[in-house]
Amino acid sequence: MISSETKHMQNYINGKWVDAKSGKQEVIPNPATGETIATVTISDVEDVDMAVAAAKEVFPEWSDIPVPNRTRYLLDYWKLLQDNKEELAKIITLENGKSLRDAQGEVQRGIEVVELATSTPSMMMGDALPSIAKGIDGSIWRYPLGVVAGITPFNFPMMVPLWMFPLAIACGNTFVLKTSERTPILAERLVELFYEAGFPKGVLNLVHGGKEVVNRFLTHPDIEAVSFVGSEPVAKHVYQTGTAHGKRVQALAGAKNHAVVMPDCDVEKTIQGVLGAAFGSSGERCMACSVVAVVDDIADEFLEKLVKETKKLRVGDGMDDSNFIGPVIRESHKERVLSYIDSGVDEGAHLLVDGRKIKEETPDGYYVGATIFDHVTQDMKIWQDEIFAPVLSVVRVSDLEEGIRVTNQSKFANGAVIYTNSGKSAQQFRNRIDAGMIGVNVNVPAPMAFFSFAGNKASFYGDLGTNGKDGVQFYTRKKVVTERWF
């Protein structure tokens, strides 16, 4: 249950809740009110070393358990997550700020990833070919890597960790997790439920902290692989540093997702889709729609209706079901977002909806309202940068060809969407867009867990994405066996 008392969040290492050796801690506010709800211990190198040692010690025992038996633990974990869905969603809203509706959606998507991980035995199966030569057979086997680490962001404190450790652990690895130090309460609950499911101690370890923890993950000789989700500059650092130290790395980075709106789209459904994609979760998601490229023929009609509907969106505490947009994560991030809105005005974009001017029921919360700019061009910062907020830029284009060109000019290529009723236009868009995840009349083209999740260009550093077969391949190594018997 959620308590009104201030909590103190600790590391979980080798079966025990412990404070970091440094004694450092940070304050965790409720973004909706600014009130302190928790403190969190902040780790350094020594704490990471302890967590890795615990994971390394239990690895031989854990990896020796047959894979069907390992996944049975996950079935129990899945059941516990299901039984605690409402509590988990409320924790997310409390410390992240997103609406309870969005938090409930995140919880469900996270549980679906655990469902996927329970099918690990079939996904780990290798290949075999008999009689590759006279009396000789060939086969491919998959084995776990050892100790692996995960670094996850504040914006999806449940779903993203569950992209990582359930699948990695089902494959036979042991895990050290660093969630965002901004959302430690949900991390604690995920670990508590994990061990309620009966997993041996040391299989999953949790360390809170900042760049010292990240850099130790990247250089620790006993960590075999690192999964990361976060901003583009850090993703690039994680990939370059980790691979330089011989580690397998997948680093999912930033985004500037475009939606191309064609004249033949269903206007009403498209507007509702854009509202959710741009302003849901306060725009703090790597699959948010942050740019709409609307074809001139429909632009005025589309924007008139979009602005009208946007102004109806309520801003406030995510615990209130009537509010569509909750706070952003911190006061510092709010100030950053406001500076981008100022920049858009200064650079000549037309401000149609101003999120700086909202009535705040809780003035100490970190609120930014839905914001829409029109006549945005590619030389403006609001088009170029990931703002991570409920700020939507509208670029007017002459046709599909220009819409594709504008979309592909972004350095990011995470997701992209087209709204159309033309199969020909959709096919052309799908084939020519650079993005790693594409939607056709799908507002947020985040795939189900049995598909891989990864972008292209500056949105992804690595080869294998998260989830699905990519996830299993990332968390295992192949051995090719050629054998003959006399």
From Swiss-Prot:
Highest taxon of source: Bacteria
Catalytic activity, EC: 1.2.1.27
GO terms, molecular function: malonate-semialdehyde dehydrogenase (acetylating) activity; methylmalonate-semialdehyde dehydrogenase (acylating, NAD) activity
Known catalytic reactions: 3-oxopropanoate + NAD(+) + CoA + H2O = hydrogencarbonate + acetyl-CoA + NADH + H(+); 2-methyl-3-oxopropanoate + NAD(+) + CoA + H2O = propanoyl-CoA + hydrogencarbonate + NADH + H(+)
Binding site for NAD(+): F154, K178, E181, R182, S231, E386
Gene Ontology biological-process annotations: inositol catabolic process; thymine catabolic process; valine catabolic process
InterPro entries registered for this protein in UniProt: Ald_DH/histidinol_DH (IPR016161), Ald_DH_C (IPR016163), Ald_DH_CS_CYS (IPR016160), Ald_DH_N (IPR016162), Aldehyde_DH_dom (IPR015590), MeMal-semiAld_DH (IPR010061), MSDH_GmP_bac (IPR023510)
Active site: C286 (nucleophile)
UniProt record similarity statement: Belongs to the aldehyde dehydrogenase family. IolA subfamily.
Function text: Catalyzes the oxidation of malonate semialdehyde (MSA) and methylmalonate semialdehyde (MMSA) into acetyl-CoA and propanoyl-CoA, respectively. Is involved in a myo-inositol catabolic pathway. Bicarbonate, and not CO2, is the end-product of the enzymatic reaction.
Subunit structure, interactors included: Homotetramer.
Name of the protein in its database record: Malonate-semialdehyde dehydrogenase 1
Gene that encodes the chain: iolA1
